[in-house]
A protein has these predicted regions:
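N-terminal secretory signal peptides that target proteins for export/translocation
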Residues: 1-2
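His/Glu-rich zincin catalytic helix
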Residues: 6-14, 18-102, 135, 139-141, ...
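Acidic/histidine-enriched segments that form metal/cofactor-coordinating
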Residues: 24-30, 68, 94-217, 266, ...
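Short Gly/Ser/Thr- and Asp/Glu-enriched loop/turn motifs at secondary-structure junctions
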Residues: 119-122, 224, 343, 446
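Hydrophobic alpha-helical scaffolding
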Residues: 167, 171, 204, 230-234, ...
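Non-catalytic interaction/regulatory segments
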Residues: 257-264, 359-510
Length: 540
């Protein structure tokens, strides 16, 4: 007969197993593509830093990226470009490696590259390097986020580098248009500010030194719980995990609360607006910008992506097909142009012909009529299904591309998606409800738009103070009651019969030599299957 002590011991063991299984089940598994040769591990360090480790078998390169949830829209008032300037300064020495070019030289001498960028809501630092040199690169990279030198003798030098970057873009139309359109935004919305920085915005002032403000900004925003790190290389995940802990566990977690103000992108009472921008080059463009509710929380349904795909459709019955028929446009694109935790915008950009310049109101009416079609009844389910199927196909057969680009993408995704969707989040497309679609469709109206005409010789009456671009902003006088011939030809896309649903591979044995399938005087078609990843792609 078994003793009571045995049963007590058995109970404790089973309870421990059950508890460990519960903990394992609570840990979300990262969703990966069936064709993905990499393996992954997510972990969170004790200081709150979120880390993704990527084992890349057979790779001769390693890479890492750190994203910080702070960007140019978080610049202090009157210090435009401070976040960007800070990005520059972190490259100029740390306590363990004080020489300003130590990191750069080590990366360069070991077959690598490095860079960083500051967007409106995040700042990302990254490098790639010969795989065997990853430990040394991490030695030099981690102190950026622990003990940067902020050496005073390099502050002026780097201010000049930022100003040179600004000056080099003064005649670049993309920057000029981007900056000019901010003048129509709500001045309380952080994105509306100048982002690059120059000698004026980054100068010392009687009441503040720029180095002191840099350090204060760093100590306010560069906190481990607002950072995401990706380390990728041809190493076992356990080894990568040891390096992550060893190098980054001392990144400080700062006791500073942070939230961005919840203010509208545009002042609602000022919409709709018409804006003219005079470019440097021969550009003719009409853009419609619609402020919408935030969409980041709806990433699993992608309502704005679905609307963008429909508006940007180029086939029969589309906006572009009618505009081309009339000779008014050459191209049309639609997509989300801004996204924060509080707001988003959808932009429709139309490349105009010379004739199209005199039909701006007619073009507007065609766009609005198509949007009315989207609103008149619930979207057909096949359109939602097609978005889901296409995204699933892209996810299933995704290619990583250059390793450094991939780790940048992953570190950015970690700021947006829960752990299980770090890879899948960009592709996940559940079927959105009709109510959700109507929520975003409601914002696509002639009363809720900034209409921007970019063309040589447009009427202007003021200038953008940062790029000296000639512009004009005024209340829109567009009348949506106008009649335009051909509106009745607009309709939603028919179901696409060419989207596959069965991805199973043919059991025919793979050939080791290319086979010619078609050979004529006009063309040759060869068949040679890809053996490793079985990707259903062709190259012409």
């Amino acid at each position: 007969m078994l003793s009571p002590r045995y049963w007590i011991f058995l109970f404790i063991v089973l309870a421990a197993i059950g508890f460990s299984m519960l903990k394992l089940s609570e840990e979300p598994e990262i969703i990966t593509s069936p064709a993905d040769p990499y393996s992954y591990r997510y972990m969170q360090l004790e200081n709150g830093l979120k880390v993704l480790l990527v084992n890349t078998p057979d790779s001769d390169k390693a890479s890492a990226a750190m994203s910080v949830n702070v960007g140019s829209m978080d610049d202090p008032a009157g210090r435009q470009g401070l976040a960007h300037f800070l990005e520059h300064m972190l490259f100029l020495g740390t306590e363990p490696f004080p020489e300003p070019d130590e990191y750069q030289q080590f990366i360069k001498q070991n077959g690598g590259s490095h860079n960083a960028f500051t967007s409106y809501a995040q700042t990302t630092y990254f490098f790639d390097i010969d795989n065997e040199q990853l430990p040394g690169a991490l030695d030099r990279f981690a102190p950026f986020f622990i003990s940067p030198a902020f050496n005073a003798e390099y502050v002026d030098r780097e201010k000049n580098a930022v100003h040179a970057e600004y000056s080099s873009n003064l005649k670049e139309d993309g920057r000029r248009i981007f900056s000019a359109q901010k003048m129509a935004m709500n001045p309380e919305f952080g994105f509306s500010e100048f982002a690059t920085g120059n000698l004026d915005t980054l100068s010392d002032r009687p009441d503040s030194k720029i180095r002191d403000e840099l350090i204060h900004f760093y100590e306010t925003h560069y906190s481990s719980d607002r950072m995401t790190l990706v380390i990728a290389g041809n190493y076992e995940l356990d080894q990568l995990a040891n390096w992550a802990r060893g190098h980054f566990s001392t990144v400080p977690q700062r006791d500073v609360s942070f939230s961005r103000p919840d203010v509208p992108v545009f002042v609602p009472e000022q919409l709709p607006l018409d804006m003219n921008i005079e470019p440097v080059k021969e550009i003719r463009r009409l853009q419609f910008t619609f402020p919408l509710p935030e969409v980041e929380s709806q990433y699993a349904y992608k309502p704005v992506s679905l609307l963008s795909n429909l508006i940007g459709h180029e086939g029969e019955g589309s906006i572009l097909a009618l505009l081309k028929q009339k000779g008014w446009a050459e191209s049309l694109s639609a997509g989300r142009s801004l996204s924060t935790e509080h707001a988003s915008t959808l932009a429709v950009t139309i490349g105009l012909t010379r004739e199209g310049l005199v039909h701006v109101d007619d073009i507007t009416r065609i766009l609005m009529r198509y949007i009315e079609l989207l609103k008149e009844q619930p979207l057909p389910e096949y359109l939602k299904e097609e978005q889901k199927l296409l995204n699933e196909m892209m996810f299933r057969y995704q290619e990583h591309g250059q390793l450094s680009d991939y780790v940048i993408r992953l570190s950015s995704n970690m700021l947006l998606f829960p752990e299980q969707d770090i890879i899948y989040g960009n592709y996940r497309a559940e079927l959105p409800s009709n109510e959700l679609m109507q929520r975003y469709l409601a914002g696509l109206s002639p009363e809720n738009m900034l209409r921007t005409l970019v063309a040589p010789g447009v009427v202007t009456d003021t200038t953008d103070p940062w790029y000296d671009t000639n512009i004009r902003i005024r209340p829109s006088d567009y009348n949506n009651e106008r009649e335009v011939e051909g509106l009745d030809t607009l309709h939603l896309p028919a179901a696409n019969p060419f989207i596959p649903e069965d991805f199973s591979m043919s059991p025919d044995p793979a050939t080791d030599t290319p086979e010619i399938l078609i050979s004529t005087t006009e063309r040759q078609v060869w068949y040679y299957p890809e053996h490793d990843f079985q990707m259903p792609k062709s190259q012409a």
